[in-house]
Amino acid sequence: MSQRLDIRGYAIVSDDDKIAGLDGLTPASLRNEKDWDYYQRALDRADLIVFGRRSHEAEPNVRGHRRLVVSREAAGLERRTDAWWWNPGEMSWPDVAGRLLPSGGLVAAPGGQVVFDLFLKIGFDEFHLSRAHGVRLPGGRAVFSACEAGVPVESVLAQGGLRLSERIALDPAHGVEMNVWRRAL
């Protein structure tokens, strides 16, 4: 593939860097209207949206976006009725991107943890990290697997070659801010 990809992650986390509760689902305490609107506008601009299986199932594709679902149950890269499905253990990202985005484009990766870990290794160009202050989810699912071991999300992003480049007071009345991390040049 000769054209450039722009890979962007999107997550809202609790104070303890969690994206989901004990049940694996995003709790109401992490849902914020202004964050949701920002996120939906970002997805509308994307040429491809990459979800994990659970995130794909939890977020119906009512807008008809082009989706890629990461799952060990897929055979390489396969087209199903609801989306493209990809098993990274059977086909490389460059091969998938070359097939689905031969001219390059914007890739949105909104999770979950498996997708975030995968694209941290592949290389995010940006990561839009919203935080819902005052929310804690003990025992919940962390944004990155390294956060499960106590590594702060900011350290994970910095170790992944990103730097904090922008702070957005997304919804101060509800304690939600966004930090945009971009690839260090």
Predicted feature locations:
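Enzymes that bind and transform nitrogen-containing heteroaromatic metabolites
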Residues: M1-L185
